[in-house]
Amino acid sequence: MNVATCTHQTHHAARAPGATSAPGAASGDPLGARRPIGDDECEQYTSSVSLARMLYGGDLAEWVPRVHPKTTIERQQHGPVTFPDASAPTARCVTVVRAPMGSGKTTALIRWLGEAIHSPDTSVLVVSCRRSFTQTLATRFAESGLPDFVTYFSSTNYIMNDRPFHRLIVQVESLHRVGPNLLNNYDVLVLDEVMSTLGQLYSPTMQQLGRVDALMLRLLRTCPRIIAMDATANAQLVDFLCSLRGEKNVHVVIGEYAMPGFSARRCLFLPRLGPEVLQAALRRRGPAGGAPPPDAPPDATFFGELEARLAGGDNVCIFSSTVSFAEVVARFCRQFTDRVLLLHSLTPPGDVTTWGRYRVVIYTTVVTVGLSFDPPHFDSMFAYVKPMNYGPDMVSVYQSLGRVRTLRKGELLIYMDGSGARSEPVFTPMLLNHVVSASGQWPAQFSQVTNLLCRRFKGRCDASHADAAQARGSRIYSKFRYKHYFERCTLACLADSLNILHMLLTLNCMHVRFWGHDAALTPRNFCLFLRGIHFDALRAQRDLRELRCQDPDTSLSAQAAETEEVGLFVEKYLRPDVAPAEVVALMRGLNSLVGRTRFIYLVLLEACLRVPMAAHSSAIFRRLYDHYATGVIPTINAAGELELVALHPTLNVAPVWELFRLCSTMAACLQWDSMAGGSGRTFSPEDVLELLNPHYDRYMQLVFELGHCNVTDGPLLSEDAVKRVADALSGCPPRGSVSETEHALSLFKIIWGELFGVQLAKSTQTFPGAGRVKNLTKRAIVELLDAHRIDHSACRTHRQLYALLMAHKREFAGARFKLRAPAWGRCLRTHASGAQPNTDIILEAALSELPTEAWPMMQGAVNFSTL
């Protein structure tokens, strides 16, 4: 395979003197928004070992002097971070601070603001990434004596345009509420946790993307003084600010010190979960605090190590990346003590200052930047991390792990649950572990393959359909889009997620090792560790599932039947004859973001089948999308309560329309009907390949953009070197080559499963068709025989044709499949149910608002036969 090997030093290469500027500069666009990654920087994005290090700022100290020599750089190694003197005449207008968690960034910011605010009229805008962080900053500022800072929560008007908002702390999603009188005149702009703040541009809750993007860009271009700080501030950010303000006006501070609570922390990745320890503890059910430890608690397991510390009287904090595991581990801990605090998205928010009252605190990513617990109360920290497509990314996990600043024993034990990662062979890891590489031990074949995969990933990001639509009005969004795709798509692979988290912890001055591998980590040992945790997670999955059952609430059906919001929901989305119990089951599934997304997509698919011209008119599809994907829908939360949740439609509908144009055609070919349970006909792998083939590459690109699934190309997977590397890094036994039809079947399964919640199931039918073979008509039998080139010239009657078909039964013995709709799919209004007398009055009213020219035309008149 003719692929150049890229070493872990690739991204440090200097830009040659006189080299051409990044694409976009020549056209008058200093941001290069048309191509967020310039060709001259391409090699930075194709080194599988150093890619994560570069994206999280680990190379800034080497990169800045080489690429922007006129930018000043200051490395601070021996104490908490400090900012440049605000009053110094040589101070530059833009200061970027990259320093680890626990390096005193916020304390230094408060000290700097105290010096910079030399007049009552000095105005300051602080932009944060979360509501909780906004409130925390306001409290810190008030306690430190910084006067007159207010939050956007205190505004009684939607637009804030004058005092007291001249010193304002605002979440980035509400930036459009700051009026022009203020926005154009701020003296100081502070972006605390700047990478997380920019990351919010990709959140489904960002409803004013174009306006927020433009306002942020204006502030970055014109504000006299800017402070941008983050533990993961990277070269992309510095390059962006240099392009806006000039490299001579940018100063970079790199803090290399972290307080002992982090630098002395020892992180250990555990190989096993230990569900047998969990089950044994729950069976004992002794009095709180009195659960006896086993004779020899198994070491190297999450629950075994946790039990040993709880039984020994230690105080423990536990991070869980999923709500369900947080509930399970809380039940386990309550066998040892009553003093357990559980914090997640479904529990009331807790005050971090009260954590010292508890022996065990369990939390999810709801506890993140801005919330910190400083007292030396906890002995150890445990972390359960489950990478999955709709879960928190590894940066969010890393930030949550830093909320407890001091651990008395200085130990962090991490279990990576690989059961949520994708197991299909079309998902291939593209990152190599940096510790293994530090000894120069990755074979050249590994680096060649993974570097090529990184290059393909970059190309897919550049080809993103969102680029053309977003680049026109959302420059910052387009500039940092690569990092967003990187963090979401790598969640499909356990190895990639583990390597990213490992890199983030290392960059934060922590010592990280893997259980049983204290010596130099070799490629073989790393791959064996991956395989071990992968199979352990699959074994433990069933035991955990049994513990996650919830008590049903029998009164919900009656409550749902009597609630007006539920009635409106049924009228808009569901068949009128749906039973209340079915509605309740559906609303439980809608409690999660992924459940709501798949529900809306399947509703839209049925709508496109009912209104076929939506596939030919963007205006018609946009009306359907606005009708179904906006507003609020009723859900039932984990507490069994009815709750209204707002839908968050995407601002870029173009790729969604393309997806439904393709999928509605496919659905029609498969005789799809949700109410009937799925596809009306079975199909073979060859049929799937034929369905996908006209637009195969577009399907892969749309799954990448809309489902964050980075599917590896079929021809690449056919390479022996790629197969060997993928098998080693996936933690799976060798799986052989992936044929063209197998690749198509995997892609088909991902399209329907990830986007619509539809299962691909093996059919028990031997012969193609929607019904039983005994019910085939004479014509249908003839078509089957002709399709397989079976001579039937001697047969005249149905009986003769049927006998001939059965005589050639083996020729139809190949695997056949069908699509199975989710259980709630039977509740939806479909094109079949639309034939009933009950018309969809609400949808008709929505479509009636479309102008006549939006509908298909024939010789200048509306073609009613196609509607």
From Swiss-Prot:
GO terms for biological process: DNA replication. Residues 1-39 are annotated as: Disordered. The keyword Transferase does not apply. Residues 15-28 have a biased composition (Low complexity). Keywords: ATP-binding, DNA replication, DNA-binding, Host nucleus, Nucleotide-binding. ATP binds at A99, P100, M101, G102, S103, G104, K105, T106. One of its GO terms (cellular component) is host cell nucleus. Coiled coil: none annotated. PROSITE patterns: HELICASE_ATP_BIND_1 (PS51192). Residues 86-251 form the Helicase ATP-binding domain. It is found in: Host nucleus. Its main location: host cell. InterPro entries: Helicase_ATP-bd (IPR014001), P-loop_NTPase (IPR027417), Replication_origin-bd (IPR003450). The keyword Nucleotide-binding applies. SMART domains: DEXDc. GO terms for molecular function: ATP binding; DNA replication origin binding. Signal peptide: none annotated. Functions as a docking protein to recruit essential components of the viral replication machinery to viral DNA origins. In the presence of the major DNA-binding protein, opens dsDNA leading to a conformational change in the origin that facilitates DNA unwinding and subsequent replication. Belongs to the herpesviridae OriBP family. Homodimer. Interacts with the major DNA-binding protein ICP8. Interacts with the helicase/primase component UL8 and the polymerase accessory protein UL42. This is Replication origin-binding protein. It comes from Human herpesvirus 2 (strain HG52) (HHV-2).
